[in-house]
Amino acid sequence: MSRKKRYFKTVILNDPKFGSYIIAKFISYIMNNGKKNLAQKIFYYSISIISIRLNKNPFILIKKILYNVQPDFEIKKKKIGGSVYKIPIKINLKRSLMFSMKWIVKNSKLRNENGYKNKLVGELIDSYYNNSLSTKQKDELNKIIDQNKAYSNFKI
């Protein structure tokens, strides 16, 4: 009989401004060292700048940006007969959103603007127009998936 306690997933509350789970999750990815209030300020500032520049609803903008970046497949490696194959696997919506948010946050830190707020604004605007490093990362993943389509029937 197992003595381990059952693991319950932590519930992430919706963000206070838009009431959205997706935005609350995005703020959690931006957060560093537990400073959620600072992460919220950074995110809301960048969203307000983007909505002013593009003259659109900020919530719809975020959904479009995440849709542009999120992948449909993921690559898992499997060793069969002494060689390692990269097998493309279809992923669910939550996992693809996780990848898109992580890529946006990671690639915004690599940009050359001053301050993280401006870096995030630049990355989000470029992601809206499909010109960002995050969308390039998605395209590279899609190329690898196309090369390894023959192995998609393998089971993991």
Curated annotation (Swiss-Prot):
Superkingdom, natural source: Bacteria
Molecular function via GO: rRNA binding; structural constituent of ribosome; tRNA binding
Annotated SUPFAM superfamilies: Ribosomal protein S7
Cysteine pairings via disulfide bonds: none
Keywords recorded for this protein, A-Z: Ribonucleoprotein, Ribosomal protein, RNA-binding, rRNA-binding, tRNA-binding
Record has DNA-binding as a keyword: no
GO biological process: translation
Keyword ATP-binding: no
GO CC field: small ribosomal subunit
Alphabetical list of Pfam families matching this protein: Ribosomal_S7
Quaternary structure (record): Part of the 30S ribosomal subunit. Contacts proteins S9 and S11.
Role played: One of the primary rRNA binding proteins, it binds directly to 16S rRNA where it nucleates assembly of the head domain of the 30S subunit. Is located at the subunit interface close to the decoding center, probably blocks exit of the E-site tRNA.
Similarity annotation: Belongs to the universal ribosomal protein uS7 family.
Protein name according to UniProt: Small ribosomal subunit protein uS7
Source organism per UniProt: Carsonella ruddii
